[in-house]
Amino acid sequence: KKEKAEIIRLGKLLAQKGATVISGGFGGTMEDISRGAKSAGGKTIGVTWYKWEKPIYKSANAFIDEEIVADSLFERIDIMLKKADAFIVLPGGTGTLLELSATLEHMNKGLIDPKPIIMLGDFWKPVLTCLKKEPVLSERTKNMRKISCCNELVTFVKNVDECIEKLR
């Protein structure tokens, strides 16, 4: 698939920039971006959690250098929020939506310093239209990013190259 190849390439480009790739550590896009990072000699961290009702994964994917096992889903997200210098959001499901919402909420309320949130493709655009009138409450976030509404916390990009460019 073209999307899979592009996510692998994204991981490779991030590693070439010297970035550590942090993900949920399991399969799908998490594995693809980690595979790409490892192919370029990069470091990967997987923040995992195993207490699903129906366990899907028994271990982190083979491309994870360091696994951090969280005690809860919320701790998993909290660890990623604290460790990341930027967030790249790929198409996904409810887990990705929860991570994105937590990231936006933490920045909106000033619980973490504002960091780049880059949305690869248009997948999440319909979800974020509801934030156009949602004000940013943190004065620090407003001043650091020169924004007033929550939808301005994110940057949409069309492709991997544009994503990497926005991280410079």
Spans of model-derived segments:
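Glycine-rich, charge-decorated loop segments at or immediately adjacent to ligand/cofactor-binding or catalytic sites
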Residues: G27-G36, W124-V136
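Short, acidic/small-residue loops that bind anionic groups at enzyme active sites
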Residues: T48-W49, L90, L104-K132, R140, ...
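Short, hinge-like loop/turn segments at secondary-structure boundaries
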Residues: K38-G42, N61-E66, K133-S138
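Active-site/ligand-binding-proximal alpha/beta "capping" segment
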Residues: F74-L111, I118
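Short, glycine/polar-rich helix-capping loops at beta-to-alpha or helix-loop-helix junctions
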Residues: W52-A60, R76, V127-L128, K133-N143
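Glycine-rich oxoanion-binding loops at beta->alpha junctions
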Residues: W49-K83
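A charged, well-structured terminal subsegment
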Residues: I79-A86, T141-R168
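Glycine-rich beta-alpha loop segments
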Residues: K1-I45
